[in-house]
């Protein structure tokens, strides 16, 4: 139960002062990441809702040019895949739910944006380990690669998933679903290029300041020290 958990934590803190500090740091870090995730989710919502160029398509549907994915990928680079993915999922799903044109696509949006964040985070933090080096060229290269990986997934997955989603879940005719998928592919490709450029510029610009402010912790290993 929660009460027993709190008692256990207090016992650990009393008997092991060092663990108390680590426990508090971990809790503070989690709270900070959740707050930053909420901020990025808000940016996803605002950028998609108010900065998009909506393109009407047959059947009363629409696709759009937007930079909402920028903050999903940025979150994955700054906070990790799960946090970035959740920021994109929450922010852009709410945006879909608030728009009558996109409301039926909200479940698809939630899943795809979460996957964008997870893929970006996997490449950036599990493969490249960008938080274990201060090498600016290395970080720039892998932030670019990670952004491309996450957004390239979306370029491929969005029209394919959208095609089957609209045809089999929403019951749209195959011809209409096919046209929508082709239009979506073109718009998603343009969005991916713009978002990649923005993410790499923003991330590499703010990273040094965030490190100094202890909002990003870099654990430089001997192998990665420069």
What are these regions (language model features)?
Residues 1-8:
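Short, small-residue-biased leader/transition segments that mark boundaries at the very start
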Residues 13-226:
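Loop-helix junctions at membrane interfaces
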């Amino acid at each position: 139960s929660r009460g027993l958990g709190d008692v256990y934590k207090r016992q650990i803190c009393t008997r092991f002062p060092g663990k108390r500090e680590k426990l508090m740091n971990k809790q503070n870090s989690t709270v900070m990441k959740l707050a930053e995730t909420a901020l990025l989710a808000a940016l996803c919502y605002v950028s998609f809702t108010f900065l998009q160029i909506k393109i009407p398509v047959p059947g009363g549907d629409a696709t759009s040019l937007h930079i909402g994915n920028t903050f999903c990928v940025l979150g994955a680079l700054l906070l990790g895949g799960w946090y970035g993915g959740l920021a994109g999922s929450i922010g852009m799903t709410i945006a879909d739910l608030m728009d009558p044109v996109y409301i039926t696509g909200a479940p698809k949006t939630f899943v795809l944006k979460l996957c964008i964040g997870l893929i970006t985070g996997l490449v950036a933090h599990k493969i490249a380990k960008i938080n274990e080096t201060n090498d600016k060229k290395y970080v720039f290269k892998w932030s670019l690669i990670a952004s491309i990986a996450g957004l390239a997934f979306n370029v491929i997955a969005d029209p394919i998933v959208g095609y089957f989603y609209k045809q089999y879940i929403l019951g749209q005719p195959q011809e209409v679903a096919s046209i929508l998928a082709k239009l979506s592919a073109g718009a998603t490709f343009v969005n991916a290029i713009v978002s990649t450029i923005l993410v790499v510029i923003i991330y590499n610009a703010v990273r040094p300041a965030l490190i100094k402010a202890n909002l990003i912790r870099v654990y430089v290993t001997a192998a990665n020290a420069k």
